[in-house]
Amino acid sequence: MRSGRAVVLWFATVAYAVVIFIASSLPVPTPAPGTGPVGDKALHALEYGLFTLLLAAAISTVRNPRVNSRAALIAFTVAALYGLTDELHQTFVPSRVGDSLDFVWDVVGAAVAAAAFHVWRSRVSRAAPVSETSPR
């Protein structure tokens, strides 16, 4: 049976993916004054960075050590593919366009988040004492 933490993380990850899909199905919002294209790209990086962190945290609850140890890489790959499908999806939404530069910033955000998760996880696992019952 999954732990409560795992259920919450997976639920949050799927809910966030749904929010991304719904947001990209809506007409293009008017940008806030002063944000311009730089703010838009930063939001893409932030959006997919957060998605990657949620994915990595959820994947790290999987009990398979091969999957668990690759949580950051798997999360990055899934987030990048989701970003690609999101941009393709927007080509079918009136008043929206699929933008390859948006996808690039989705990938940048996902890569930074995956790297940060990997570094954090490496440091936490080195600092944690190894018990005699834990698998090596």
Where are these regions (language model features)?
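Membrane-interfacial alpha-helical segments at the cytosolic side of multi-pass membrane proteins
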Residues: 47-62, 108-121
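Membrane-interface capping segments at transmembrane-helix boundaries
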Residues: 119-131
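Short, conserved structural micro-motifs that define repeat-unit consensus positions
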Residues: 40-55, 79-90, 98
